[in-house]
A protein has these predicted regions:
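Hydrophobic alpha-helical segments
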Residues: 335, 395, 435-534, 588, ...
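Terminal end segments
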Residues: 513-571, 575, 668-810
């Protein structure tokens, strides 16, 4: 058996740092009835060596596709169809920067990544000795073999799928095109006024996670400072092709995905039969194999259990004996786009501080299976990666990120959250997370807490963060706001914390994406209303609350009461009948009789009404080429499936905001309804819905129906790269607006208890003969039936539930 020192030699020099030899040591892996691995070791290296080994047994093909996807190397394995994808990925990150960060880590932190990598490689060695039984069938089917892993590979899976996914959202180029289009259609004044409605910087009535009055917006007064030089006008020099960021060489995914997360955290006074309760539902989408991987880490300062996306080297959603933690996307804006003026005599130079300077550039070689290699030039300005390069137009666009250079530090802070024993130690790790992710806390004393992570820039006054700004040097960031200015709260007066990617706190600015905003209408109200409706919750009641919220149409509560009232005195019987059906609806989209249709006729009535109401409100005020973005209701496709979650769409939020303002006589700026009576418009939309449904399904309103949608576990990862065979796709019968996984931690009076459901299952392994792992889909029915399974933390509980045990030596 090779020693740890020998195993490290294969990756010794990629960081250029000598590694210290160690004596051979043991790792014990114990698996429970659902295949969850609990790793025991006395060294950090050993703990993560066991983790890497275990996940390689279960998820090797997914791991390999994740490695290739996040580094832009898919074409070398899957062929020429992925060349443009690889080019886009290569442009979006700097391998040299990541390696430099890794090289600076202390040895104990290097051991996390190196141990994990060598654990994977240990399993690769075992496959080499018995490929006929151990090689995952997907490799055989696709004609390539897994490669050995390094620390860099381990880090890049986290960086590429978490930081470069949730931390990198930006639609400033699209926003500019949207503004230009509205000005062209409605004139300068009205176009800008409409833009302010669609992409408002601040909506004071948007619900917040930090209760109003428990965080002071004034702490962010330093977010903008006077310019040191005269700022240039923010104008788009030339119209760009519509939605330039949708170009396949630039897009990481659709700019409007259905993901994100929800959570409830209950403190001592809001918990019944418990000291504190945390229930998280991270919504990454639904995939085969499961997006998250369950793990227990025990030893060398770790004693935690939970799960983590892609099997990151950490417990991202979990607990130890003292605290529990969770997270959701925070949506704070710490990414900006800069417009660069190219030198007309040399387009590889750009204007900065009055002089043309050369771009940093590197040549990337893209290997292509069965084809010639391709080369691409990747540019970088002082602001960051060049994401749009148009030499023929004399312009380029660069992206500056608040987290750049802190990717590895963020990974390590997330890893060490699981070692915290109290709120102070938890905050000490969260403050080092550079991306815009919300973090949540509860402990065995009944305390609860929340903090928005991320580094947020100090911008120059006049910098509209929704639009690209000049990259000539006038709008450079002036530093970063301290963590203390991020919204946070400890033991709020409400006794609970809840979030569904809503606004963190009053005064915190809206996101800059055209497809995501914080308004009065927010799906988090489905949680707030239920939490406020009961003085305290048992753990099972908290679970039921989250499950029930997952079936509610998040739009309905904001429109149905007013629509019903408006229809009360209609002289049309069909309108009154439809309104009566809506009045009796609890906003739930269920299929209790399992006939493949949602139970209430209110579902088709409301969905069709919302479609028509959006068209009547927004259809003729937005440019033809852009209006479609804002007319979607966001509902799941009847009879089809969705790999993600459901939110209130921006068009719907803006329409609702305008309805409130009009009713209160406070409408300002652009009049969305053009002076029309809003109630009359609502009734017109209802009549159009009645006409449409009558034509399609007959005149009996009570018989109108909508086919159910399903929860699809897609065989492609979030980047659209196949990570499983097409025949591996599966589904739960009814679509649910809930977490990809759900995890529940209960600090009971006699200790901590954990529960989770991670569908379809722990393993994605299929043997060469087609035999699937027994844990391939053994949590699919649990998820569909709204149930969960226990997780285990103590040595006694783990021993009692161990069905398989293995000891490794490294």
């Amino acid at each position: 058996m090779p020693s740890r020192f020998a195993l490290q030699l294969s990756t010794l020099f990629f960081l250029g740092v000598p590694l210290v030899p160690a004596q051979a040591a043991d790792v014990t892996i114990k698996r429970d009835e659902y295949g969850t691995a609990h790793v025991y070791a006395s060294e950090v290296y050993g703990v993560f060596y066991g983790y890497g080994y275990a996940i390689a047994q279960d998820r090797l093909y997914q791991l390999e596709i994740s490695r290739l996807s996040t580094q832009g190397q898919v074409a070398q394995a899957l062929g020429k169809d992925y060349v443009n994808f690889d080019i886009g990925i290569r442009k979006n990150y700097s391998p040299a920067s990541i390696k430099e960060q890794l090289a600076k880590l202390p040895q104990a932190d290097k051991d996390i990544l190196e141990g994990y990598a060598q654990g994977i490689n240990k399993w690769l060695d075992e496959i080499d000795r018995n490929p006929a039984a151990l090689m995952p069938k997907q490799f055989i089917d696709n004609g390539f073999t897994p490669q050995r892993w390094t620390s860099f590979d381990v880090a890049m899976v986290f960086i590429g799928s978490m930081i470069n996914r949730f931390g990198d959202y930006n639609s400033e180029l699209q926003n500019q095109q949207l503004l230009d289009g509205m000005i062209a259609q409605s004139g300068d004044k009205n176009g800008k006024a409409l833009f302010e409605k669609l992409l408002s910087v601040d909506n004071p009535d948007a619900p917040t996670t930090v209760p109003k009055g428990e965080w002071q917006p004034s702490v962010r007064n330093g977010a903008y400072v006077p310019a040191k030089t005269k700022a240039v006008a923010q104008q788009s020099p030339k119209p760009l092709p519509l939605l330039a960021l949708n170009d396949p060489t630039l897009a990481w995914e659709s700019p409007k995905e259905r993901a994100f997360s929800n959570i409830i955290v209950l403190g001592a006074k809001k918990s019944k039969d418990a000291k504190a309760i945390l229930l998280n539902g991270p919504q990454f989408g639904f995939y085969q194999p499961a997006y998250t991987y369950s793990i227990g880490l025990h030893g060398a300062g770790y004693d935690a259990v939970g799960n983590s996306p892609f099997g990151y080297p950490m417990v991202e959603f979990g607990y130890n004996k003292d605290i529990t933690w969770g997270s959701t996307w925070g949506a704070g804006d710490n990414v900006d786009i800069y417009r660069l003026e190219l030198n007309p005599k040399n387009p590889e130079e750009y204007l900065y501080q009055g002089q043309y300077r050369p771009f940093e550039k590197r040549i990337e070689t893209v290997n292509v299976k069965g084809e010639k290699t391709q080369q691409v030039t990747v540019y970088r300005s002082v602001q960051g990666a060049v994401v749009e390069y148009q030499p023929e137009a004399g312009v380029a666009y660069a992206k500056r990120r608040g987290w750049e250079g802190e990717e590895v530090a963020t990974l390590m802070s997330w890893n060490k959250v699981s070692k915290a024993k109290n709120h102070e130690q938890w905050v000490d790790q969260v403050q080092h997370s550079a991306i815009n992710v919300n973090w949540y806390y509860a402990d065995n004393k009944g305390n609860i807490g929340y903090a928005l992570g991320g580094r947020y820039p100090v911008r120059v006054q006049g910098h509209d963060n929704r639009l690209p700004v000049s990259g000539s040097g006038d709008f450079e960031w002036q530093g970063f706001m301290p963590f203390a200015t991020n919204p946070q709260v400890y033991n709020p007066k409400t006794g609970y914390i809840a979030n569904w990617n809503n606004r963190p706190a009053e005064g915190f600015p809206n996101p800059d994406q055209w497809w995501y905003s914080w308004n009065t209408a927010d799906r988090v109200q489905t949680l707030f209303t239920r939490l406020d409706g009961r003085p305290a919750f048992t753990p099972s009641q908290a679970w039921d609350l989250m499950m029930e919220a997952g079936f509610e149409d998040p739009n309905a509560r904001f429109f149905v009461p007013r629509l019903v009232k408006a229809a009360e005195h209609s002289d049309q019987a069909t309108v009154r009948d439809a309104a009566a059906i809506l009045a009796g609806w609890n906003y739930q989209d269920l299929d209790a009789d399992a006939d493949g249709r949602y139970d209430s006729a209110a579902t088709p009535i409301f969905r069709t009404w919302l479609k028509h109401m959006l068209a009547l409100s927004l259809g003729d005020v937005l440019p033809k080429d852009q209006v479609g973005k804002f007319l979607s209701t966001g509902h799941f496709t009847p009879g089809g499936g969705t790999p993600g979650s459901q939110n209130i769409e921006v068009g719907t939020k803006v329409m609702h905001q305008a309805m409130i303002a009009t009713a209160a006589g406070k409408a300002k700026g652009f009049d969305l309804f053009k002076g029309k009576d809003v109630d009359a418009l609502m009734l017109k939309a209802l009549q159009l819905s009645i006409d449409e449904l009558s034509a399609e399904q007959g005149p009996d309103a009570k018989s109108w129906h909508t086919e159910i949608a399903h929860t699809i576990y897609a065989p492609k990862n979030f980047l659209g790269i196949p990570q499983a065979g097409e025949k591996e796709q599966m589904n739960n019968r009814l679509a649910m607006n809930r977490g990809t996984e759900n995890n529940l931690t209960v600090f009971a009076m006699d200790g901590v208890q954990g529960f989770e459901v991670v569908a379809p299952g722990q393993s994605g392994f299929i043997a060469p003969d087609g035999t699937r792992s027994k844990h391939f889909d053994d949590q699919l029915a649990l998820y569909g039936d709204l149930k969960n399974k226990r997780t285990w933390l103590t040595e006694e509980d783990i021993k009692a539930h161990t069905v398989e045990e293995k000891t490794l030596t490294y």
